[in-house]
Amino acid sequence: MTEYKLVVVGAGGVGKSALTIQLIQNHFVDEYDPTIEDSYRKQVVIDGETCLLDILDTAGQEEYSAMRDQYMRTGEGFLCVFAINNTKSFEDIHHYREQIKRVKDSEDVPMVLVGNKCDLPSRTVDTKQAQDLARSYGIPFIETSAKTRQRVEDAFYTLVREIRQYRLKKISKEEKTPGCVKIKKCIIM
């Protein structure tokens, strides 16, 4: 069974835990309890492949920012979550993305941009703004509602598909790299 290490990042109060718990337990948590760090595991079937999702739900509060580098090192893919009714959380996405790229030392890291709380009428972030940002990053964008469960699975499963593509690209790049010839040596004593 293939394991995928997913990390959910974003500002405090955007619904990272609500999305994760909705996926894992089919339950909406409506009281806000700031997360320090929670880990969840769930076995699912995506495109006919049985997968084990290892999901790290992270702290959005700035006082826990020192912990970010550590979980960013171990994560394979990142759900970058903002709330559609919180412009600041949308603006913060750039900071999270840059930090992920720095820690991973790569421009090419599997990510999905997630606009959560799409069930709310009080939108301050336009869908087109988010689509344009995702397009500029070269990543998918999905609007979700942890409350109604709208596209929650889709967000996580899309990230798994992004990781799969990344893994395949990495393997094919390694196979094409010249100079990867094993040199055999003899030691004469």
Swiss-Prot record:
Q: What is the effect of changing V14I?
A: In NS3; affects activity and impairs responsiveness to GTPase activating proteins; characterized by a strong increase of both intrinsic and guanine nucleotide exchanged factor-catalyzed nucleotide exchange leading to an increased level of the activated state
Membrane topology classification? Lipid-anchor
A molecular-function term among this protein's GO annotations: protein-containing complex binding
Q: Where is this motif: Effector region?
A: 32-40
User: What does the UniProt record report as the effect of altering K117N in this chain?
Assistant: In colorectal cancer samples; somatic mutation
Lipid linkage positions (N6-palmitoyl lysine):
K182, K184, K185
Q: What is the effect of changing Q22R?
A: In NS3; impairs GTPase-activating protein stimulated GTP hydrolysis with unaffected intrinsic functions and a virtually functional effector interaction
**UniProt-annotated stretches for the region Hypervariable region:** 166-185
Effect upon mutating G13R: In pylocytic astrocytoma; somatic mutation; increase activation of the Ras pathway
- Free-text function comment from the UniProt entry: Ras proteins bind GDP/GTP and possess intrinsic GTPase activity. Plays an important role in the regulation of cell proliferation. Plays a role in promoting oncogenic events by inducing transcriptional silencing of tumor suppressor genes (TSGs) in colorectal cancer (CRC) cells in a ZNF304-dependent manner.
Protein's name in the database = GTPase KRas
Species assigned in the record? Homo sapiens
